[in-house]
Amino acid sequence: LVRKRCERLYEGRMGVWNGSLKAELRPAEIVLAKKTRSFTAAPLDTLLGAKVCVDDFNNWFYSKNMECPWTVGMTKFYKGWDEFLRKFPDGWVYCDADGSQFDSSLTPYLLNAVLSIRLWAMEDWDIGEQMLKNLYGEITYTPILTPDGTIVKKFKGNNSGQPSTVVDNTLMVLITMYYALRKAGYDTKTQEDMCVFYINGDDLCIAIHPDHEHVLDSFSSSFAELGLKYDFAQRHRNKQNLWFMSHRGILIDDIYIPKLEPERIVAILEWDKSKLPEHRLEAITAAMIESWGHGDLTHQIRRFYQWVLEQAPFNELAKQGRAPYVSEVGLRRLYTSERGSMDELEAYIDKYFERERGDSPELLVYHESRSTDDYQLVCSNNTHVFHQSKNEAVDAGLNEKLKEKENQKEKEKEKQKEKEKDGASDGNDVSTSTKTGERDRDVNVGTSGTFTVPRIKSFTDKMVLPRIKGKTVLNLNHLLQYNPQQIDISNTRATHSQFEKWYEGVRNDYGLNDNEMQVMLNGLMVWCIENGTSPDISGVWVMMDGETQVDYPIKPLIEHATPSFRQIMAHFSNAAEAYIAKRNATERYMPRYGIKRNLTDISLARYAFDFYEVNSKTPDRAREAHMQMKAAALRNTSRKMFGMDGSVSNKEENTERHTVEDVNRDMHSLLGMRN
């Protein structure tokens, strides 16, 4: 595949690029100014061929971030931003240059300069050289399909969807920056003493010696000569006011922490694009991570997250342990590379177990904040949410020793509960036991103590259990935990291995792959809802492709079905029920099975198919209706074990012997009597 794409690029056959609007939130004033940004996606042919040409150079380029005057490939976490800002000398003038309409303003001259750099760095390979030239020709003069169906051809600017956009943009700004410095009269040696700059795409950040600040005034015109629109008016004396890639570094514990504008972080919470509840929780966690350093904002996001976890369906995810969370210690580690202390981690686990109540633990959600309160307890129904202060905030599960300690505490609690149950046989006994891990306190003789409520065991020694030689043949501990799904052990549906053999057999007979089988089985399920799963069906079944009927032979379905086709289709019961409910959400729909039985209640339509699996959750009314329909379908039905014998011959051998004295051919002699 890649070879074919490279061949196409080598021959100069251009693909059509797809132009679309970027899905993003932008300030109202920018929208009113009609500065909506577009995105041009490369066709697959160009994309794969281009990656062969540019990937090696790009990987080298990423590896040189911070060593050379660019930050492409750096991470803002683990003190990456601190390293970046400390590259700028203290006391200099700092400028965050603002480039506008960058991609569309790039001239073919700059793109050709990037091509020259790549050709210089490239190995000696004539085919690759031609591919690279054709690629940058296509990037400069690109055929673009717009959303209204028009194809336009641009003659300048870079494409946002090509595989080397950021590296190419960085190189073009780098070339322009060197051009501006040389034009201002600074050679390489002088430049190192008076100017430090870093680039990432169209973002440019400059630190310049105060004695040479006037040079910045000439940069705008120098950049314009190469077609770039840059404003160098934003100048600062404090590094914390310097904006780069929409971030500015704020000092926390003498470390520069990168921070987005609070409005951008709140926008992550406001704009909900998620299709699954898990994705919504991940977006909130992302906002929490970005907000660290804005103490008030982090606290408010944690409060919002607490509220979200009390709402459906997020509360169920939290109970299942599927709600992501990052502790204060985790965030501090992410930005500063500082590990949490053992005391912090132990405090977190101790607080977790201290709040557990009863035999079934309630939902516990821990939130850390930077507030001065030690603990803020918020209760809602059976949910406890704890806000821990910065000093008390810890992260759990980071150390094996802590896990062992956690398991040990659980075992001690179980032993304590068993002791309490054993000591509850006498109703007058008073429990004076203390919490696990606490010192025994002196008992005040003036108090009555606490009574232990007796528990009834599910299985007791009084039960009559099957035994051999006095020993029980059942493992009661296993039986207490053995709660299989009814459908997995029911003999009304095929086993997993039987279903797998049926699937493989049908797939091979039909000559389909797994993706095609998925579509085909959709049609089969709907056909069986309408026509049933009788073992006597034959001929063909059909599914619709638009307005066209597509026939499939029924024979493979029945041949490979063991024990029966209905038991195979029982695996589709739940999906069929959901399909009928989906149809009824938009139209009145009753399967033919229900129509034939004259089922008048449309609310029972979802149960009106013959391979429906009745289970413990089936409503009584639906179960009765299904049984009545089944009884009506099978009324007066009988099956003969034997049919007519296929052998129709009834020949038999005549062993009768006659003589001339016999009366006739049917009668022997009557003792000498004659007519």
UniProtKB/Swiss-Prot annotation:
Domain RdRp catalytic, chain residue ranges per copy: 92-216
Keyword field contains Nucleotide-binding: yes
EC identifiers of the protein: 2.7.7.48
One GO molecular-function entry: nucleotide binding
Ranges for region Disordered: 397-447
Keyword Nucleotidyltransferase: yes
Compositionally biased region (Basic and acidic residues): 397-424
Domain of life of the organism encoding this protein: Viruses
Residue numbers marked as site, Cleavage: Q388, S389
GO biological process terms on file: DNA-templated transcription; viral RNA genome replication
Family annotation (SUPFAM superfamilies): DNA/RNA polymerases
EC class of the enzyme, as a word: transferase
Keywords for the protein's UniProt record, in alphabetical order: Capsid protein, Nucleotide-binding, Nucleotidyltransferase, RNA-directed RNA polymerase, Transferase, Viral RNA replication, Virion
Family: Belongs to the potyviridae genome polyprotein family.
Name of the featured protein: Genome polyprotein
Protein species of origin: Papaya ringspot virus (strain P / mutant HA 5-1)
